[in-house]
Regions:
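Accessory recognition modules or surfaces
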Residues: 88-89, 93, 139-150
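Conserved acetyl-CoA-binding loop-helix of GNAT-fold acetyltransferases
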Residues: 82, 88-101, 113
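Recognition helices and adjacent regulatory flanks at domain boundaries
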Residues: 28-29, 39, 91-94
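Short amphipathic alpha-helix that is part of the acyltransferase structural core
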Residues: 1-34, 41-57, 145-146, 151-179
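Short glycine/serine/proline-enriched coil/turn segments at secondary-structure junctions
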Residues: 68-70, 137-138, 154
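Conserved beta-strand in the GNAT
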Residues: 47-49, 55-66, 73-81
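Conserved active-site alpha-helix within GNAT-family acetyltransferase domains
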Residues: 105-109, 115-140
Length: 179
């Protein structure tokens, strides 16, 4: 279960294992280029891994962002991947909770995510209405844009999420038009 996993920041030596995890976790999506780029900006993208003994069990990234007109205080969660054989054992939940704690400790007050509402709502995420994603989402994905308020600010942000260049690919924010 989740208590058996050690969560820590990833190191450069972990990159190959992290990159090999994503095709197994998301066989229908190619997230490797994004993850590779995020691993190259450790001051902006906080990369966490869950270790099961000496084996990689999961990975999560939280990217520091801002809202147009404001400075910082916002992060984008994702991608999150768990070794398929270890899914539904609390690995992803443990990674995300640890990441949220770390974000709060660094002064982040809002964490946004584009993901399954049924999963993320269990972790305290709610549909986000004040901060818009950097690209328009398909109507059927509207409920997938969510956030969790961590405190650290008296007034909520409103506006468009400003993401680093690694996230500025419209294909990351909607279904593949070729599908």
């Amino acid at each position: 279960m989740a208590g058996e996993f050690n969560i820590r920041k990833s190191r450069q030596a972990d990159a190959a294992a992290i990159l090999s995890l994503y095709p197994r976790s998301f066989p229908d999506e190619d997230l490797v280029p994004l993850v590779r780029e995020l691993l190259m900006i450790p001051d902006t993208a906080i990369s966490l891994i869950a270790m099961n003994d000496s084996e990689l069990a999961g990975h999560a990234v939280l990217t520091l962002c801002s809202v147009a007109g404001n400075n910082g205080g916002v992060a984008l969660l994702g991608p999150v991947a768990v070794e398929p054989a270890l899914q539904r054992q609390g690995v992803g939940t443990t990674l995300i909770r640890d990441g949220l704690r770390r974000m709060k400790e660094t002064g982040v007050h809002l964490v946004c995510v584009l993901g399954d509402p049924a999963y993320y709502s269990r972790l305290g995420f709610v549909t986000e209405s004040l901060v818009e994603p950097p690209y328009p989402l398909p109507a059927e994905w509207a409920g997938a844009w969510q956030s969790q308020y961590l405190g650290n600010s008296l007034t909520p942000d409103a506006g468009t999420l400003v993401v680093p260049s690694q996230w500025r690919d419209p294909a990351l924010w909607g279904p593949d038009p070729a599908s």
